[in-house]
Every structure is written in structure tokens, then in C-alpha cells.
Amino acid sequence: RDSVVNAARAVSVQVQSAIIQFSSNFQMALNPQITKTYAADDYKMMHKLIGRSSKFTFFFLLFLSLPIMIQTDFVLTIWLKTVPDYTVTFLRIMLCTTIVDSVANPLMVAASATGRVRLYQSVVGGILLAILPVSYIILETGGDPNSVFIVHLIFSVIAFAVRLFIIRPMIKLDLSEYMIILGRIFMVVCLSLPLPLLYHYYRDCLLYTSPSPR
């Protein structure tokens, strides 16, 4: 079982790394501007850049990841022929985690720009380090390998929220404005998922119910 899980994780990490590379290149243009506007005390423009970076990164990654997440079996079968167990679920959860971390990245850049990162790194780093013992406990108590990646996703969301509240006073961020951006992101998710999921479900129903050729 361990070898199957390791193979599944290796495949998932390969795909995740490619997606992360795309998002890093996309954000690279805005990151120096976030630092520059903080140095110039132009908080208003800095907040706009953080919002734009979070929003556009999310849209870009959703555009790349959604087809893969919906058609994971199909994509992996074409690529690998024989897909290791757990790979489909691992990859889907890891892509969700990647999107959360990428949306949070502008906040990390803003924290670095202030130079006051001790509290930020201690708290956020502590949250992320907790993934390891929590995952170990879950596995020791009979948890499924998928649970490790679910734990990672949950802790990434928690770390995102904590980042936001720690950084908010450091850069004078209007929390309500940023929450509006997150609300729009959530709305896009709600609007973009139903049709692809319905199509995927309908196609699978046709495949499983169609009579086999004689």
C-alpha cells in the first residue's frame, strides 16, 4: 500500500508543480509593485494590487485546474495509461490547496514588505507545522491516505484566515474590501462549477447505461 500511495503522491506533485509554476510566473509581475507601493506609503494602491493579484491568480488557476479536476481520470489515463490508486483524489485536493495558497501569496508578499514578519512567521508557520502531527494521528487511528491531503487543505484555509488578520493592521488593509473580493471569487466558483459537473455526471451516466456492443 505504501508504494501505491507514494506513486500516487509523486504523480500528483508533478501536476501540482506545473500549476504552481504557472501561477508564480503570473504573480511575479505584481509582487515587486506591492513592495514598492508599501515603501512609498501608498497603501491604497497596495491594497488594489493585493486584491488584483489574489483575484486574477484565482481566475487563472481555476481556468487551468477546473478541467483537470473534473476530468482527472481521463487526463491521467491518457498520460499514464495505468493510474495508481488514490492519484485522482490526491490530485484534486492538492489543486484546491494550491489555489488557496496562491490566492494568499500576495498577503505573504505584503508581510515581507513590512519587514515585521516575526509574529506572522511564528503563528502561520506553527499552523502549517501542525499538519504533520495531525496527519500522523489520523493515520495511526485508521485514517485513509486521502485524509492527509484533506488535513493539508483545511490547515491551508486556516492559515489563509490567520494571515489576513495578522497582516491587516500591518498594512492598514480594509478587511471589508478584501472580503468583497473573496466573495466575488466564491461567486465565480458557484457559477462555474454546476455546468461542467452536470456534463461530467451526464456523460458518465450515458457511459454506464449504454448497452454494450454484441
Predicted regions span which residues?
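Alpha-helical transmembrane segments
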Residues: A110-A113, F165-M179
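Helix-loop junctions and terminal segments of transmembrane helices
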Residues: S12, Q16-S54, M108-A113
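Membrane-interface junctions at transmembrane-helix termini in multi-pass inner-membrane proteins
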Residues: L95-L128, G142, I171
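Alpha-helical transmembrane segments of multi-pass membrane transport and lipid-handling proteins
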Residues: S23, H47-S102, L132-E140, C190, ...
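Alpha-helical transmembrane segments of multi-pass membrane transporters
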Residues: L119-P145, F155-I166, R184-Y201
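Interfacial/gating helices of multi-pass transporter permease domains
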Residues: R1-S17, D85-T89
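Short alpha-helical transmembrane segments in multi-pass integral membrane proteins
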Residues: L49, S53-M69, V124-L128, N146-R168
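Conserved small/polar residues in nucleotide/adenosyl-binding loops
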Residues: Y208-P213
